[in-house]
Design a protein with these regions (language model features):
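Extracytoplasmic beta-rich repeat domains
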Residues: 1-8
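Beta-sheet repeat architectures centered on beta-propellers
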Residues: 5, 15, 35, 44-200
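Surface-exposed extracellular loop regions of Gram-negative outer-membrane beta-barrel proteins
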Residues: 18-42
């Protein structure tokens, strides 16, 4: 459609369909008797892979690659105080530099209080052929975590987050228990000095 690139995914937000393509997204509304329709386009909003968007309680979560030099993680949501046709692709990743990753097999997912994106790391400007990095954002605090998880797809099963391994035909349960299963843990967290609310 109109040089928007290949169709990738479709999601419903307040009885309106949003059709994501590679370079553009369309807002499709139809009447109840199916005699009339509108198809409004949103320039510069697009996804590179069918799994690069997902339905979330607040809207549609997606990795926007319409501007390849400025990739952003966004949430398409209804603007507060407006009708259900007025949406905004709000960036949730302004403090992240996402230009050093590839998104050919990007996965977006919402699990509990986490908005998750899995992407390909670039080494010497060459992208891995598989997802090798996970970004997880806590929606309550807004804090991002970068994890070395190799994930090709995500799904929730009885509350647990199940990940398809991007290097093998295996499934993993993520964020469960305290056992590292013999893996080397390369993730770390650095924070500022804090007295944790005490005067001492």
């Amino acid at each position: 459609q109109d040089n928007g690139g290949n169709f990738m995914a479709i999601f419903n937000l307040n009885v309106i369909e949003y059709c994501f393509h590679l370079l553009k997204t369309w807002q499709l509304t139809t009447t109840l008797d199916d005699t009339n329709a509108t198809n409004l386009d949103y320039r510069n909003v697009g996804i590179s892979y069918p799994r690069a968007a997902c339905q979330a309680p607040e809207g549609i979560l997606f990795a926007d690659l319409a501007r390849p030099t400025e990739p952003k993680f966004r949430r398409l949501q209804v603007l507060e105080g407006t009708d259900n046709t007025t949406v905004e692709p709000k960036s949730i990743s302004d403090f992240l530099d996402l230009s050093s990753y590839a998104y050919d097999k990007c996965v977006a997912y919402r699990w509990g209080d986490y908005e998750i994106f899995c992407v390909q790391e670039k080494i010497n400007e060459v992208a891995n052929s598989y997802n090798s990095v996970m970004f997880a954002r806590n929606v309550l605090s807004g804090a991002w975590s970068k994890l070395d998880y190799y994930v090709s797809c995500l799904e929730t099963y009885y509350g647990s987050l199940i990940a398809g391994d991007s290097l093998s035909n295996n499934l993993n349960v993520l964020f469960s228990g305290y056992d590292d299963d013999g893996d080397v843990i390369s993730n770390h967290y650095i924070s500022e000095d804090s007295n944790l609310g005490t005067d001492n």
